[in-house]
A protein has these predicted regions:
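N-terminal, charged low-complexity regulatory/assembly segments
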Residues: 1-132
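Short, functionally important structural connectors and interaction interfaces within domains
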Residues: 33, 59, 145-147, 199, ...
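Alpha-helical interaction segments
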Residues: 34, 38, 113, 151, ...
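Hydrophobic packing positions characteristic
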Residues: 81-209
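C-terminal structured interaction module
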Residues: 200-264
Length: 264
């Protein structure tokens, strides 16, 4: 057997849920006085899958805490069968878990669980995102008056955006605080959660619907500051003050970068 063929067989064996090796692989290995080749392979197989389960539990502690060991491991093993590790780093092992849940469970069960998984993954993405230089209040104070109307901004790389239709934040907080998990409940109104990294600390904040629409307008749809004020015209003379208040909050949070008008 060529080395490449042997390596492929070992990989297929480790990725399989069945701990019994095929005869060709087993016969290629030597037993010792204390351990047979089949026993050695089984130990390696179990250790590998245990490490994958450990990684998924670490990435999704709230999902794990909500389901418990047995149900989480059953879900995780089904996920690993459908999505074997394809990356050299365990960092990306759980990237598709939320989408998998949507197709694996019936919709009534999948919706709150996949939303919680997306929330946890958003925290992971925020922490690992590339650095960005946030626009500061000091820089804004120095901005010439004529530049305010054309001001455009974008989100920093670490900022993640999630619309929650269930009490996923309450479940996540219960896990963080090691408290009792509340029952999963649909929200009366959807909740927009923004997650970002502040130096080495991951932070989050829930936004009211009007603030979420304003932030999305400026950072996704490309509104200028003048256009934001225009969207708030129903507030009358209070529109500029509301726009400035939101902008100050976003800058204090450290969410934004300025888009240079000179860039193409």
């Amino acid at each position: 057997m060529r080395l490449s063929e042997w390596q492929a067989q070992v990989q297929a064996y480790l990725l399989s849920r069945d701990a019994r090796p095929n005869p060709a692989l087993q016969s290629s290995l030597l037993s010792s006085a204390a351990l047979s080749a089949e026993q050695g392979l089984a130990i390696y197989h179990n250790a590998y899958r245990a490490r994958l389960l450990e990684a998924l539990r670490g990435d999704y502690p709230a999902v794990h805490g909500w389901l418990g060991d047995e149900e989480f491991d059953a879900l995780a093993l089904a996920y690993l069968d459908a999505h074997p590790s394809q990356h050299f780093s365990l960092r990306w092992l759980g990237a598709q878990l939320a989408d998998f849940i949507d197709g694996y469970l019936v919709p009534a069960q999948a919706a709150p669980l996949s939303e919680l998984a997306r929330l946890e993954w958003a925290f992971t993405l925020a922490f690992d995102a590339p650095d960005g230089l946030p626009l500061s209040l000091t820089q804004m104070a120095e901005l010439p008056a004529e530049d305010w109307p054309i001001l455009q901004v974008r989100l920093l790389p670490s900022v993640q955006w999630l619309v929650c239709r269930h009490n996923s934040l309450a479940l996540w907080r219960a896990c963080k605080e090691q408290g009792d998990f509340p029952g999963s409940q649909p929200l009366e109104e959807v909740e927009t959660c923004v997650i970002w990294r502040d130096q080495l600390i991951t932070r989050y904040r829930s936004l009211a619907a009007d603030e979420a629409a304003a932030l999305q307008g400026m950072t996704v749809h490309g509104w200028s500051f003048a256009e934001l004020c225009g969207e708030l015209a129903h507030l009358g003379e209070q529109a500029p003050a509301q726009a400035v208040g939101w902008l100050r909050q976003w800058l204090t949070d450290g969410l934004l970068q300025r888009i240079d008008s000179a860039q193409p």
